[in-house]
Every structure is written in C-alpha cells, then in structure tokens.
Amino acid sequence: MELQFRQPHFSDALLLLLLSNLLLWEKASSIPACMAEKSGCWNPRMETFDSAIRKAETLRTVSKQFYVELYHNQFSSGKFATLTSKLVRRDEIVFRAASHCHSTLTNPPNKGIQYITIEIPEYLKTLINYVGAWISPLFHLVIELSAMKDVPETILSKAKEIEENNRQILRDLRWIITEVYPTSKKKEIFPSWELLSFLKSSSRNSKFLAMFNLSHCLEYDTQFFLFHLRILKCRITGKDC
C-alpha cells in the first residue's frame, strides 16, 4: 500500500513560523537585558553599577586622604588642633560639628539589617537622597577653597575630585532607578547643611569649623556609599553577592 504524503499547506507553514517566533521571544525575554558587543553581551545595568562602585571606591580613598590632609597640612593643622582640643573639652558647638552629619536626615539603612529588609525602590530613593545631600556642601567647598589665597593645591585638588565623584555617583543612581523602576515616583529631598553659612563666612574660624564637620562626616558617609552600592548591585542584578 502506497503511503500518501500531504503537501504542507501555506497556513500550516505560517503557524509553524508564528510558533517558532513565539518560542524565540520567550527565550529572549528570559535573558537579562544586554547589548551585543564583539566581546559578548554588555549589560548596561551591570556596567552602571560597576561604574558607580569604582567612583565610590575613589571617593572613599580621597575623602580619607582629605581628612588626614586637613589635620596635617600647615594650611589647616593649627585650626584643626584647636578644634580637637575644644572637642576633648566637650565644647558644645565643636562636639556637634564632629558628631552631627546632616546626611543622616535622609535615614539611610545604616543600622542592623535594615539594608536587607528595606524594599529595593525605597532603598534606591534613600541612597539617592543620601548621596545627594552632599551635592551642595561639596559644590560650595570647592568655591570657598578656590577663593582662599593660601590653600595648597593638594587640598583643593582633592576637594574637586571628591565633588566630581559624588556628582557622578548621583547621576549613575538616577539612571539606575529610571532603568529599573521607570514608573516609580522619583521625589528627591536633599537636606540642607546647617554649616553652609559658616563655610561662606569671612571668618576663617567659621570656615574651618565647617570643614571640620564636613571632613568628619565625609570620612564616615563615604564608607556607607560604597557598602550600599554593593548591596544594591547584589539585590538588583544578583551578581557579586
């Protein structure tokens, strides 16, 4: 008995094509977003996180150097020695300058396991405000230091590098939240720095009190910038956990 083979109908071929395309689409949708590169797959989210983390590492290092420089450079060492002496004697104004950081008003998850329990969108918004809290103080620090005739280049250059890296980290965080949560409301609330008027004062004592506060808080905050960026990268991308 001769077997009869049915010629494929045009509609059957079209159905097969549609099914094939559907399977390809489902497979593609399960792969993390990336862009074709000669060396492989480029993931813009990963690249932006890595970029922000590198800047945060630089920011941390330069902030520590800036802190040490202000204590040892002839430009500021005398003023900082006087402020340290007052701090030991629990002078109220100096004690607050050394212990109160305006950035804490953003309520960063720096205690316990808050960084694990906080929702990711809220975590991103909080970190944006935490980093953003330094935009104005650092901008004015560079302006005021640039206007001081006796400021050493080593101090001024570090201030500029700190300001630039902080600004770029904020830019990266804004890109990430827009990319990951495009419909999320992105209300930014940057707390004001209470010692800004001291920094802009004509009194050198007031200026150095403001720098005393700024250097202490930066030395503290920058380690948490780096910590939170690494945690967020893990929680959002699942990499480097």
Curated annotation (Swiss-Prot):
Disulfide bonds: 34-41, 101-217, 234-241
Secreted found in the keyword field: yes
UniProt tissue specificity: Expressed specifically in the placenta. Predominantly expressed in spongiotrophoblast cells.
GO CC, alphabetical: extracellular region
One Pfam family, short name: Hormone_1
Sorted UniProt keywords: Disulfide bond, Glycoprotein, Hormone, Secreted, Signal
SUPFAM superfamilies: 4-helical cytokines
Localization per record: Secreted
Glycan attachment residues as annotated in the record: 213
Signal sequence extent: 1-30
Any one GO molecular-function label of the UniProt entry: hormone activity
Entry similarity comment: Belongs to the somatotropin/prolactin family.
Protein name: Prolactin-8A8
Organism phylogeny: Eukaryota, Metazoa, Chordata, Craniata, Vertebrata
